[in-house]
Amino acid sequence: MPRDYSLDKVRNIGIMAHIDAGKTTTTERILFYTGKVHKLGEVHEGTATMDWMVQEQERGITITSAATTCYWKGHKINIIDTPGHVDFTVEVERSLRILDGAVAVFSAKEGVEPQSETVWRQADKYHVPRIAYVNKMDIIGADFFNVIKMIKERLGANPVAIQIPIGKEDTFRGIVDLIKMEAIIYEDDLGTVMDETEIPDDLKDLAEEYREKLLEAVSEQDETILEKYLEGEEITEEEIHKALRKGTINGELVPVVCGSSYKNKGIQPMLDAIVRYLPSPLDLPPVKGMALATGEEIERKADDSEPFSALAFKIMADPYVGKLAFFRVYSGTLNAGSYVLNSTKGKKERISRILQMHANHRQEMEAVYTGDIAAAVGLKDTTTGDTLCDENHPILLESMDFPEPVISVAIEPKTKAAQEKMTTALLKLAEEDPTFKTYTDQETGQTIIAGMGELHLEIIVDRLRREFNVDCNVGKPQVAYKETITKPVKIEGKFIRQSGGRGQYGHVWLEMEPAPRGEGYTFENRIVGGVIPKEYIPAVDAGVQEAMQNGVLGGYPVIDVKVALVDGSYHEVDSSDMAFKIAGSIAFKEGMKKANPVLLEPIMKVEVVVPEEYMGDIIGDINARRGRVEGMEARAGAQVIRAFVPLAEMFGYATDLRSKTQGRGTYTMQFHHYEEVPKNIADQILEKK
């Protein structure tokens, strides 16, 4: 099966937005118009609305599918879903990794909100070209020009309006296209009957003013346009499109369009802007990775003839086909039924089927090509962030970093009978979401779930009920404390049982030292001259890691430690993996006691937005919660306070903030780093344990 769309006609985009900007409606409308245009041949006037109802019913698919494919004017568009809530910034990061471009949706009333800033900065980090869509032009308080000002001031971007609205609030009825210099007026509620006419008289001056700004912006991108502009010559539509595309892809400007998704206005021109200005996989630099054999950096060009390489970016449990692994192909092609190497795990996997999701149906694919996004059935060991590649040309693409969970709760099913069902469901959910973990507390035997915030865990519990029919009781949220060491030690570990029969003999010397915060655990083998045979070394490492699950202070996991195996001895007959594993474990536990162990707690990056008159109270409150205020700034009539606060002090903050600001304050927080707990507080925590 040959490729159906050439690579320059493929767009992989995300729709980024704050929760209330209207992302879902916008996505649905895109799918509606693209689906309808794609099926023009068979849709008679009467069935269009019918089709729309089916889509409404199938809406579940469009919203939850990690990637949906649709078509517009000879282009193939893959839309990757990005959530808007701050507990899910990890989801946003992982979708931005595999996108080529994005549409940032803003509400015409609120404009740039704190969460839109977070997402925008993440997109900056991955250099994602984007266009802005100012939605909700029909609501009270809509102000297109104010949003442009906010994009410039708050996001430090260079917004260039390529349209201006005709009317606003309940009189919003169309747009002025500043490139063609004509008006598009919507005649019906479905937004399919459009009238292209002259610009209304009362908007001519404004249109001229914004056309000038547009021409200034594009002339900076292109010498020939600049000369024509200065000479006062006519600049063609084609030249404007070309310069806008160049500026968007190199991140120097952001084309801005407007509309009302709910009222079906402005969607088609936005789709035109997606295919005109956002990049295809060919417009971006080759993807970089590491050659497994040599450890050198290598790259893969976006080309079907290159060896196959792809990144799995989301795992979903599907009621019909089991586990779906969504992946993005960076190079080469892949046929259904073939084998790939999961180079992250070092395992060969067979892809039994390949599916592509459309608005209301899924399509079986015989093959996928460079730039495609699809879902694979049959991958058993693949998890989020893994590289899939051609086994004869292995490459390891840069994986995604996922933060450790910072909050945990005990959970139990309401009926004993549902225990097994709950355990299976939790493991499935943990497979989908790398920032969600589930384990059993060694001391109490309770099942513990851990995640990135209270909302994150609430949603997990809700999914248990909705998708797996398991009702659960949930304990009080607990902070995920960790332990570490603060000074280097050298320690001996012996496990020797030699009293008749088969004995046990394991003997190791370890050097332990603190690692920089956030580095995690490293194990180094410094054995020389075979004092411990090679085959027992991994067992020592495993023993150390097992001991790290429960620290010596309060049984919390141990992080940020460097361990080196430096010496030891073995016995020809009695030594075994088991003996060395136990010796490694004993040595680590003993060493940790001597290495000044300390307790660590998660520190959250908190952003509070409050009216000025409450600022003193709120800062006082943050200090009382052991917080450090990092900075403040004024933002649209309110003050933004940025601070680092221990998670332990943030429980119930939403309620406190509401009462302190009469419901006018809002806040967002996300995990930032781990830090040592002050001694007096650590003592209190460990006493309660």
UniProtKB/Swiss-Prot annotation:
Gene Ontology BP terms: ribosome disassembly
Location of the protein in the cell: Cytoplasm
Residues given in the record as GTP binding sites: 17-24, 81-85, 135-138
InterPro entries: EF-G-like_DII (IPR053905), EFG_II (IPR041095), EFG_III (IPR009022), EFG_III/V (IPR035647), EFG_IV (IPR047872), EFG_V (IPR035649), EFG_V-like (IPR000640), G_TR_CS (IPR031157)
GO cellular component, as recorded: cytoplasm
UniProt keyword Cell membrane present: no
Domain tr-type G span(s) in chain numbering: 8-282
Keyword terms, alphabetized: Cytoplasm, Elongation factor, GTP-binding, Nucleotide-binding, Protein biosynthesis
SUPFAM superfamilies: EF-G C-terminal domain-like, P-loop containing nucleoside triphosphate hydrolases, Ribosomal protein S5 domain 2-like, Translation proteins
Signal peptide interval: none
A GO term for molecular function: GTP binding
Keyword hit for Transmembrane helix: no
Family: Belongs to the TRAFAC class translation factor GTPase superfamily. Classic translation factor GTPase family. EF-G/EF-2 subfamily.
PANTHER family documented for this protein: RIBOSOME-RELEASING FACTOR 2, MITOCHONDRIAL, TRANSLATION ELONGATION FACTOR G-RELATED
Function: Catalyzes the GTP-dependent ribosomal translocation step during translation elongation. During this step, the ribosome changes from the pre-translocational (PRE) to the post-translocational (POST) state as the newly formed A-site-bound peptidyl-tRNA and P-site-bound deacylated tRNA move to the P and E sites, respectively. Catalyzes the coordinated movement of the two tRNA molecules, the mRNA and conformational changes in the ribosome.
Protein name: Elongation factor G
Organism taxonomic ancestry: Bacteria, Bacillati, Bacillota, Clostridia, Thermoanaerobacterales
